[in-house]
Each structure stands twice: as structure tokens, then as C-alpha cells.
Amino acid sequence: MFAVFLQGALLGAAMILPLGPQNAFVMNQGIRRQYHLMVALLCALSDMVLITAGIFGGSALLSQSSLLLGAVTWGGVAFLLWFGWGAMKTAFSKNIVLASAEVMKQSRWRIIATMLAVTWLNPHVYLDTFVVLGSLGSQFAGDARSWFALGTMTASFTWFFALALLASWLAPWLNTPRVQRVINFFVGVVMWGIALQLARHGWQ
């Protein structure tokens, strides 16, 4: 069973590591040290729910409904364009103001809402968990499927907490106006690139 667990962990890591809306948001919260561990936990818990749904039967729902898949795809395109636009606005802003403790208190629920949107409106999450993991997980039966799912969940929890903690540790070097502009510009380019790829896929 350990081999199945390791297979799930490696596959989960391969899909989580590339930069996407989730990773960008967790990284930025870590740099700002704004509820970064809470954000990492909520991202990991969301992934756990999606992984469970995808591996234990949810993949059939998405793959069999072209209407639902289209809604997820184009909703994701719109969200990625909006997310990228926000990053670009920050990148080219003349004044990047670091959040104070009072601002962080006021923005807790907004941070949670943004994190949930970044996760649940991200089409790659459904494609990865429902289509890729769902199809691979269906090859296992009984306990083996549970071990495969546990491996992918372990990779998710490990990565999000590691990213949040590393970004927080590097915050003194990363949390400067110049570096923030570079990071946000890069995030904006990547988000728009993903949106373009999804749009091309949606038109096919």
C-alpha cells in the first residue's frame, strides 16, 4: 500500500507545484504574513474535499456533462482575467501600501472569501482532481484507492504549509515595493496565460 500512497503523493505534487491562483494567493499571504497559515489550511482542506469527490466518483459527473464543463471553463476564464488584472494593477501602482494590523483584522473574511474563490472557481482544480486524479484513482479498488487519495492529500497539505511558511520566512526580502511589483507582474502574466489557454480549449 505504501507504493500506492507514494504514487498518489508524487502525482499530487506534480499537479500542485506549478504556479496557479492558489499558489500565488498563498505565497502573497505568506509574504504579507496575513493569516497565511489559515489560508494554507483552508486550501488544503478544500483540496481534500475535491480530491475525495474526484477519486470516489465525481469525475463521471464532470466528464459526462459538456454544459457543466463549459460553465466551469468559462467561469474560470473570467475569474483568471480578473485575478490577473488585479495583480497587474498592483504591479504598476505608484504606491504599494503594506497592510497594518488593523487592516488585517478588517480583511480576514475578505481573505477567506478570496481564497475560496481562488480555489473553487479555478477550473484547473476540477480538471486535476475530477478528470486526472479521478481517472487514475478509479484504477484502484478498495483500500488501495483510499491510500492513493491519502497520498495526494498529503502532498497538498505539505506543499501549502511549506509555501506559506517559506514565503513568511523570506518576507523581509520579498516584502518590498520593487519585489512586490515583479511578483505581481509575473502572477498577472501567468494568470492571463492560463486564461488564454482555457479560452482556446473552450472554443474547440
Swiss-Prot record:
Annotated membrane topology: Multi-pass membrane protein
Residue spans crossing the bilayer: 1-21, 37-57, 67-87, 111-131, 147-167, 179-199
Location of this chain's protein in the cell: Cell inner membrane
InterPro entries membership: Arg_export_ArgO_enterobac (IPR023445), LeuE-type (IPR001123), Lys/arg_exporter (IPR004777)
Organism domain of life: Bacteria
Cellular-component GO terms for this entry: plasma membrane
Catalysed conversion reaction: L-arginine(in) = L-arginine(out)
Tagged with keyword Cell membrane: yes
Entries under Pfam families matching the protein: LysE
Keywords: Amino-acid transport, Cell inner membrane, Cell membrane, Membrane, Transmembrane, Transmembrane helix, Transport
Main location: membrane
A GO MF term: L-arginine transmembrane transporter activity
Family: Belongs to the LysE/ArgO transporter (TC 2.A.75) family.
Its biological purpose: Involved in the export of arginine. Important to control the intracellular level of arginine and the correct balance between arginine and lysine.
The protein's name: Arginine exporter protein ArgO
Species per Swiss-Prot/TrEMBL record: Pectobacterium carotovorum subsp. carotovorum (strain PC1)
Classification lineage: Bacteria, Pseudomonadati, Pseudomonadota, Gammaproteobacteria, Enterobacterales
